[in-house]
Amino acid sequence: MKKTATILSNIAQKYHVFIGSSLQLLESSTLPVNLTINDMSASKTVKEVLDTLCLIKQINPHTYNKYEYSEEELAEEYKEIEPSKNPDVRYYACVVDKNRAGAKPTLLFRLNLAYNIWEELGYLRLKQEFLD
C-alpha cells in the first residue's frame, strides 16, 4: 500500500494534479470523534506519504445526544445534532488526522444520500459530560 501511495504521490507532484483515495476503516467501537490511523484496515505506513488524511465515520443516530457542534473551532455556544425526518440524511464525523497545509480539526458533515450532497456544518466535539 505504501509503495502504491508513494508512486501516486510522485505522479501528483510531477503533473500538479490531485489524487484522492478511499480506504476502508476497521469495524470497531471507536467513537467517530476518536478515530486514529489505527482504525484503518490498510497499512498504517501509508500515512507517511500522504499530504492529508481524513478519517470519516457515520455517527450512530442513537448517540446524537453525545455530540455538539459550532461554526467556530473555539465557540461559546454549541448546537445539538438534530435528527432528520428525512430517512436519507446521515451525519458524519471527519477527523483530519494529517494535514501538511495546516489545522487538524474534527468536523461534522450532513449527507443526503438521495442527492449525494455533503454539507459541512461545523466543528464537532463530544459534550463535556461524555469526556473521559
Regions found by a protein language model. Give the residues of each.
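C-terminal regions of RecA-like/P-loop NTPase motor modules
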Residues: 3-15, 27-132
